[in-house]
Amino acid sequence: MQAPSTQRVIVGMSGGVDSSVSALLLMEQGYQVEGLFMKNWDEDDGTEYCTAMDDLADAQAVCDRIGIKLHTANFAAEYWDNVFEHFLAEYKAGRTPNPDILCNREIKFKAFLDYALSLGADLIATGHYVRRRDIDGRTELLKGLDPNKDQSYFLHAVGGEQIAKTLFPVGELEKPQVRAIAEKYELATAKKKDSTGICFIGERRFSDFLKQYLPAQPGDIETTEGQVIGRHHGLMYHTIGQRQGLGIGGLKDASDDPWYVLRKDLTRNVLIVGQGNEHPWLFSRALLASDIYWVNPVDLSTPRRLTAKVRYRQSDQACTLEKTENGYRAVFDEPQRAVTPGQSVVFYDGEVCLGGGVIETAQAWYEDAR
């Protein structure tokens, strides 16, 4: 294995504290470190929703502080073609996609990695809270040490070959430790708030953003019995398990329990709702997934006992995974709430992230009980 002092590493600098500390730690470990700030969205309305200029200034301040060069690259065209158009297509089809997962696969671990290698880098590094392990000729993706910050869910579609060319310096740390290091070295990002939400939406209301690209198609809101109790502005604005923004209230003979989105009937353009956080239609026993990406090849010649997450920050859920003619079927030991088509299911074997795919359909718990 090459000594760090002979290896050139380019760190993806986002202007946040995690990538800042990643660059600092790699320097301390003896690597030849440079930074790269990538711009993935071109603001066309003059209001700088993505705060790209502020983030670039913060990244530059950190690089100046620790004495490394900062490259810049614009991957907006790649982002539009490989992430954003898919994002719109999924919403148009009535599903709820996760663009961060595609961004990691197509931009950070493809466009950025390729560009860094073209600059002469041996490796790249990011501020993700994950770890890697080289074992038996392959590179595994492991959960980050901090369970509150583990980001393996978002990196499940990145292949082992890409993981093998990446360092994750903060994956072995907990978030408070990272902030403490940034403060100790007086980095400009030490107290910077973590970014939330999707870059290209920024602080705008999601519905306002989506209206710019997709025409709204209003339709009926129905109960599970087929009673029309309201109107929706477009199925794309709603997701399974949603409670807020339905505009339902004051119905005769209805209880005071809150209403939740249970289903989206795409054929009829109808939103199906029900009352109560424990409504049986909210819970699923099994799901079918497609577009599966494995970090490394996985043997599913027979059903396999694993754990899974159907959303970020969910605790590990025991399941049995099997390959079928129609995709991959996961059957859970316990009912899963608000399993959402378009979102990702990610599979684990202990601390190893095996990979995952897109949820196509969910089998309701009550259907299984019949």
Swiss-Prot record:
One of its GO terms (biological process) is tRNA wobble position uridine thiolation. One of its GO terms (cellular component) is cytoplasm. Pfam families: tRNA_Me_trans, tRNA_Me_trans_C, tRNA_Me_trans_M. It is found in: Cytoplasm. The keyword Transferase applies. Residues 149-151, 311-312 are annotated as: Interaction with tRNA. This is tRNA-specific 2-thiouridylase MnmA. The lineage of its organism: Bacteria, Pseudomonadati, Pseudomonadota, Gammaproteobacteria, Pseudomonadales. The gene is mnmA.
